[in-house]
Amino acid sequence: MCRKVCTFAHQKENCAISFAINNDMENSFNACIEESIKKYWNFDALTDYKGVTLQYQDVARKIEKLHILFEESGIQKGDKIALCGRNMSNWAVAFLATLTYGAVAVPILHEFTADQVHNIVNHSEAKLLFVGDVVSTQIDPEKMPDILGIVNIPDYSLMISRTEKLTYARENLNLLFGQKYPKYFRKEMVNYYKEQNPDELALINYTSGTTGFSKGVMIPYRAMWSNLIFANGALDKHLHPGDNTISILPMAHMYGMAFEFIQEFATGCHIFFLTRIPSPAVVAQAFAEIKPVIIIAVPLVIEKIIRKKVLPKLDTPAMKILLKTPFVSQKVRDKIRDEVYKAFGGRFYEIIIGGAAFNQEIEQFLHFIGFPFTVGYGATECAPIISYNDWHDHVPGSCGKAAVNMEVKIDPVNPRKIPGEILTRGMNVMLGYFKNEEATKQALDDEGWYHTGDLGVIDAWGNIFIKGRSKNMLLGASGQNIFPEEIEDALNSLPLVVESIVVQREDKLVGLVYPDFDEAKAQNLSMDQIKKAMEQNRLTLNATQPAYCKLAAIEIHEEEFEKTPKKSIKRYLYK
């Protein structure tokens, strides 16, 4: 990976890490991508699991062709290009092509509904939209009137073109490439756009797609660059050119993008994309075959594999006795650890877990057997890293210490005893929310602190312990941001619903509803009929929601929810 040119001075101060940097961006983010492609030209780069492999030189050619497509169709530096589809090599190439051309990428979760995709494309002012197979069948181009065209990610064919320039460029792309490079295309010819200053906008990552709730997080190049510096420092000794890695998390999510794709690509690794739904069986098979050297995951992936492949073997009377026998216990634990290690491919240095809360039972079990894992903490607004510790230094229950270039503090000040809001600032922090000054002012204060909305404490050694969320946002099993108010807003508009709360129970969402009993009485409805009506409401609601926002059940409350003087429901009373 390209080496950092920034210089840093770290010091512990009030349980935070301060930083000072030299803003010389000569070795910029896009320069890192360019250097990686040139340096690892003949290395395997990207593989769609069970599919075709692209070498770094193949990636360079595809990027160059997309640059020609952008230029010939009139895309300017700073224009927005949206991408919405499952993880695959061509998604990664299109993303890199966007940034290295000088355009702004707008990654969109493929799980968003069609209306959410339309809203994001329109709100972001995107000029082009790249879509995957499934997304292409769901969206309506007429609801995105300002885009020049839609490009199919699997083969870069045009789904729709609204300009002659775009149509001509795509139909003659190979010819145009041949005219620009009549003899050959070599690595010496790769010359990408370099960002002009650290605060230049690199991408906009939306936390939600619903009109009225959309927040497009503006990620500058300094944040992308700083996350690379962090990852290089944390993993440089364990991640090497040619190593196999797996991309499971959505690349449209900052966690998956930064640490399952960009870091590995900059290091010269061979990245395998799981193009199918990452079920426990598919993931376990991929781990066994690919044998990744670093595993980045959300808790659910780890928990399901352990619960399915490991814990059943331990739930026997004989094993329980052995684990309690002092002179046998350590040998048994070592054997169990080896089995768990094999379940994840058997070659990795550590598993880094983040994106959602980790199950305490599983975390305690992994510590008990001495398994190499750690838990990090981040946010989309920090692109994403806030804190991390190597697994050797991981403190149970914590999510590490402030990452390089970042400060963390607790407000109000009594960080070691009383939980307060976690605040962070540094190079990783966003510029703000796109076209949303009010939300930006609420999230970023005048001193540059990002207010996370999370409650926590910091111990004497700087380890951060999250105690809860002051915001109402929930986290899906794969780290998706879930805003209950949006679901409640839709639920409250359905028949017989007066008010509702959406709560999370393990990885399931449940709607708590206070029905309109007066209306039910007027219709002579029994309680059984009200329950049937609520089940129909659940089905109706789920048809409009992405998979991770669907309700598993609706529970009826026979009394109104308790409220504050401002008539807000006291959410903390309901679980």
Stretches with model-predicted labels:
Residues 41-42, 170-206, 213, 238-244:
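Conserved pre-ATP/AMP-binding loop-to-beta segment of ANL
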Residues 474, 499, 504-510, 538-575:
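Conserved C-terminal "lid"/linker of ANL adenylate-forming enzymes
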Residues 1-73, 77, 96, 101, ...:
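N-lobe entry segment of adenylate-forming
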